[in-house]
């Protein structure tokens, strides 16, 4: 729904060698200037796949584990033991994932702990929190092991 969030998520995916799967309807064009601006110059680093619906995604990746981010979940995102290839599923910012999608998958629904008074987090922030927890558990595969310290003159 919000082009800037999608751009931020694309940048996160680019920086971590993650594929970004988008499910139609998107509500904006992937070429939207706000999407492009938020993703900066990282677009060549991210594999973006657009699917007509969630069933198309399931059909293309039938052997993957899917985790559904929802404020309604009983399990937190850090209780899961993530594996390479796991799929993290998020809904639109304004309404989250539909109840019909969550029926029957309650054990794979995850949430980020927060105070009762808050409805939800910004979508791109939630994606980053959960994605980095998964990466942390997997010991940050394929990512840079050390930073580049500024050398004194």
Regions found by a protein language model. Name each.
Residues 1-153:
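Post-transcriptional modification and biogenesis factors for structured RNAs
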């Amino acid at each position: 729904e919000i082009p800037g969030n999608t751009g931020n998520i694309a940048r996160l995916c680019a920086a971590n060698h993650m594929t970004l799967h988008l499910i139609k309807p998107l509500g904006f064009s992937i070429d939207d200037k706000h999407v492009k601006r938020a993703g900066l110059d990282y677009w060549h680093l991210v594999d973006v796949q657009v699917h007509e619906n969630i069933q198309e995604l399931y059909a293309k990746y039938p052997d993957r584990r899917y985790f559904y981010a929802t404020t309604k979940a009983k399990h937190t995102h850090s209780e899961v033991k993530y594996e390479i290839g796991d799929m993290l599923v998020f809904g639109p910012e304004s309404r989250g994932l539909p109840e019909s999608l969550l029926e029957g998958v309650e054990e794979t629904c995850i949430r980020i702990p927060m105070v009762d008074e808050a409805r939800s987090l910004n979508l791109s922030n939630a994606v980053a929190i959960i994605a980095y927890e998964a990466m942390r558990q997997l010991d940050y595969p394929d990512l840079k092991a050390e930073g580049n310290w500024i050398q004194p003159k």
